Amino acid sequence: MTNQTRNVVVVDCLRTPMGRSKGGAFRHTRAEDLSAHLMKGILARNPQVNPSEIEDIYWGCVQQTLEQGFNIARNAALLAGLPIEIGAVTVNRLCGSSMQALHDGTRAIMTGDAEICLIGGVEHMGHVPMNHGVDFHPGMSKNVAKAAGMMGLTAEMLGKLHGISREQQDEFAARSHARAHAATLEGRFKNEILPTEGHAADGTLFQLDYDEVIRPETTVEGLSQLRPVFDPANGTVTAGTSSALSDGASAMLIMSEEKANELGLKIRARIKGMAIAGCDPSIMGYGPVPATQKALKRAGLAIEDMDVVELNEAFAAQSLPCAKDLGLLEVMDEKVNLNGGAIALGHPLGCSGARISTTLINLMEAKDAKYGLATMCIGLGQGIATVFERP
């Protein structure tokens, strides 16, 4: 370890298209395949990097069982044919897993334990459902409401506490689909999506190069017809205002600033600040607020300094209170989730942290922005945030 921490930079970031979990293009594609494809793809885009110099792979994944079990990070690296000397570990901080992978890799480089790390994450929610094998200890109910394990009910609770109306949620969800669809049509996702083999409806193989989860036909009127799904009698949260179920993977290539300069690689962003925070599990969706406040303080910046923000859209009823308390509601159209978010693209749990960071970096470049924030809520009451700076 060195005594002085070093600057850590992102030299590239990439993701698969988001596949629909129910009968989508990746229905015959395993989570390891999505991961291995990205690992190979990001290295192919950066031939200056000798794979043997990668110290470790940190890969987020939540449901670590079945095809995602037994250290999927290592399994995917072996499947990709990467040098056997590279280490690999699977990281789990639920929804924040691949952002946690970014933080872990960043710290390893900061302290001098690594020069180059590959980070990312995956979740195939079609093959391994979110609730597969979940078995909470009954004694937890002494400290945590049972409903805190039901994400939709925590969104209902947070929405009620902050007076978020059904209409506001429907408008936010329609915005997500509209912006994601516009981003697709205008090619704004092109640089971040690695075309990935999938199966068409008739079973033939094809290269998927767009997010098939987006519903361009979504309207506020259409959403208003949906029934509340978690609290049918009194609720406001519907399937339409919740993040879609999707399958996908994301990856980022990070290294010390010195190494990037030595290899002649373009520095796309620096990691400027990182934080996690806990909050009441019953309003787990509020986690981005304390996590962002911590990360900004560590970066010596304020929310007003952020030119672009990616706030993971677990639920509209959760995103809006966070945006409100972070002081972002007035600048939504200039700064927040400009290419839509998880309501349109889906929230493959282990993938999303690096996914929103990848989208953020591409948006920062498109807007010639200096600072950006990526933040997300985490089941059972946590938040995670990363502040990025463009050189």
Swiss-Prot record:
Superkingdom field: Bacteria
CDD domains, sorted: thiolase (cd00751)
SUPFAM superfamilies named in the record: Thiolase-like
Entry keyword Acyltransferase: yes
Chief location bin: cytoplasm
Enzyme Commission no: 2.3.1.16
Gene Ontology molecular function, alphabetical: acetyl-CoA C-acyltransferase activity
Keyword Ribonucleoprotein: no
Pathway(s) served: Lipid metabolism; fatty acid beta-oxidation
UniProt catalytic activity: an acyl-CoA + acetyl-CoA = a 3-oxoacyl-CoA + CoA
Localization, UniProt: Cytoplasm
UniProt entry keywords in alphabetical sequence: Acyltransferase, Cytoplasm, Fatty acid metabolism, Lipid degradation, Lipid metabolism, Transferase
Single GO biological process annotation from the record: phenylacetate catabolic process
Gene Ontology cellular-component annotations: cytoplasm
Signal peptide: none
Stored NCBIfam families: AcCoA-C-Actrans, fadA, PRK08947.1
Subunit structure and binding partners: Heterotetramer of two alpha chains (FadB) and two beta chains (FadA).
Primary role: Catalyzes the final step of fatty acid oxidation in which acetyl-CoA is released and the CoA ester of a fatty acid two carbons shorter is formed.
Name listed for the protein in its UniProt record: 3-ketoacyl-CoA thiolase
Provenance organism: Vibrio parahaemolyticus serotype O3:K6 (strain RIMD 2210633)
